[in-house]
Amino acid sequence: MIGYLEGTLLKKKEDRILLLAGPVGYEVLLPAVVMASLQGKREGDPLFFHIYHYQTERQPKPVLIGFNTEEEKDFFHLLITVEAIGPLKAVQCLTLPIGEVAEAIETGNSALLGQLKGVGGRTAQKMIATLKGKVGRFADAGHSSAPDVPVTGSLADQTVEVLVGQLGYKPNEARLMVAGALKRNPDVSTPEALFDEIFKHGQAQ
């Protein structure tokens, strides 16, 4: 069972990366919030991930899901205990930092949870019913970490790429979402802050 991988970036795709660890290349599936933290990373850059190894009789091909921190991985373990949220759906819905998702659960904010990809009103209520009282430590810890980077055209462009390629928005819609977020808050300095600005104003439906 693989629990941790360290190596260099070989290739970056829409929702996964190919990590070269020694002579072996591992395909690692990443939630959008983790992928956003890799903005600016290039081929050959060193990377490491805490890994959730997913394999069942119905899913015989191993799937490696990567996280930046043990905290993110621990939250993921709790998230998949919610009825109707399996590992692949959990990856899909983690479009906000875990601190914000946890806070929404603890405060019963079903409106924000319902904005996560693949999470409707019913699933949002299930998340609250199952996890409220269990994820406070993640909310207290705040947003998951990501490298501080200046807000540049590259940051905006790559955020658009994540919104389109991984979250399913149309290019024009994604560009408007990013532009609106940057107009409201021109001091955005991290990928999380940009996604936060987009989602907290209800633009991501």
Curated annotation (Swiss-Prot):
Tell me the compartments it is located in: Cytoplasm
Q: Where is this region: Flexible linker?
A: 147-151
Q: Which Gene3D superfamilies match?
A: 5' to 3' exonuclease, C-terminal subdomain, Nucleic acid-binding proteins
Spans annotated as Domain III: 152-205
Region feature Domain I, mapped onto this chain: 1-68
This protein's record includes keyword Protein biosynthesis: no
Q: What does this protein do?
A: The RuvA-RuvB-RuvC complex processes Holliday junction (HJ) DNA during genetic recombination and DNA repair, while the RuvA-RuvB complex plays an important role in the rescue of blocked DNA replication forks via replication fork reversal (RFR). RuvA specifically binds to HJ cruciform DNA, conferring on it an open structure. The RuvB hexamer acts as an ATP-dependent pump, pulling dsDNA into and through the RuvAB complex. HJ branch migration allows RuvC to scan DNA until it finds its consensus sequence, where it cleaves and resolves the cruciform DNA.
Q: How does it assemble?
A: Homotetramer. Forms an RuvA(8)-RuvB(12)-Holliday junction (HJ) complex. HJ DNA is sandwiched between 2 RuvA tetramers; dsDNA enters through RuvA and exits via RuvB. An RuvB hexamer assembles on each DNA strand where it exits the tetramer. Each RuvB hexamer is contacted by two RuvA subunits (via domain III) on 2 adjacent RuvB subunits; this complex drives branch migration. In the full resolvosome a probable DNA-RuvA(4)-RuvB(12)-RuvC(2) complex forms which resolves the HJ.
Q: Which NCBIfam families match?
A: ruvA
Protein name per its UniProtKB record:
Holliday junction branch migration complex subunit RuvA
The gene behind this protein is ruvA
